[in-house]
A protein has these predicted regions:
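Blade-edge beta-strand/turn elements of extracellular beta-propeller
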Residues: 68-82, 157-168
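Short, conserved, GDST-rich strand-edge loop motifs in beta-rich repeat architectures
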Residues: 26-53, 111-142
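Repeat-based blade/solenoid architectures
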Residues: 5, 54-58, 80-93, 144-146, ...
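Acidic carboxylate motifs that coordinate Ca2+ or other divalent cations, activating on Asp/Glu
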Residues: 14, 100, 104, 185
């Protein structure tokens, strides 16, 4: 789980801790293909041969199944649960956002420049670039604000995307996020840090 953002919390009525780890898998096909990182097959299999699991860029929701021989046994259910793709993600928050007793999921995401955008870098690779034009070309790297994701816990190990319904679909470049009951009314607020924009509550 190097270089990845994660949180631990029980997502169901159980004493076993589950955890979520977020990565950079885009939800829509265009962004997914344009920003797909290059795969190095030799490095991929070398990593597997060293005893690590297959490495893919998508979120994982590790469901704590049971304890076997004093060790926890987990299953990745992110695709089944509907939360595997939330773009360039940073701050996963598992909290009861609608006060129904079940943990919902908020994921902040965004990057100021699409540094993996293959279309852009293929295009400029065909041009001669002078040293003094590097800043210019860097400033032209595509930049697309996207909405954060909010998922309601369906109480059956699946989640529904309620970002728009709950009014949490502003497009921006978010990273850090926390939750707190700022006004002591029993409902949680979400505080989000945005790049080149004001923070949001």
């Amino acid at each position: 789980l190097q270089r990845r953002r994660q949180r631990q919390m029980c997502i169901r009525d159980s004493s076993n801790l589950d955890y979520i780890q977020v990565d950079m898998d885009a939800k829509d096909n265009r962004r997914s293909k344009a920003n797909m990182a290059s795969m190095d097959p030799d490095l991929f299999w070398s990593t597997v041969n060293y005893g690590f699991h297959y490495q893919y860029m998508h979120n994982t929701l590790q469901l704590n199944r049971e304890i076997i021989d004093d060790k926890p046994f987990f299953s990745n259910i992110s695709r089944l649960s509907g939360i595997s793709s939330t773009d360039w993600s940073w701050g996963p928050l598992l909290a009861d956002l609608d006060n129904d007793g079940w943990k919902d999921l908020f994921v902040s995401n965004g990057t100021r420049r699409e540094i993996n955008n293959k279309d852009y870098f293929n295009e400029i690779s065909l041009r001669p670039i002078a040293k003094d034009s590097l800043l210019y070309y860097t400033s032209k790297i595509p930049s697309e604000p996207i909405a954060n994701f909010t998922f309601r816990n369906n109480q059956d190990l699946t989640f529904s995307d309620v970002s728009e319904v709950w009014g949490l679909d502003d497009k921006n470049f978010s990273n850090g996020a926390v939750y707190a009951d700022l006004d002591n009314d029993g409902y949680l607020e979400i505080i989000v840090n945005n790049i080149d924009q004001e923070a949001q509550i």
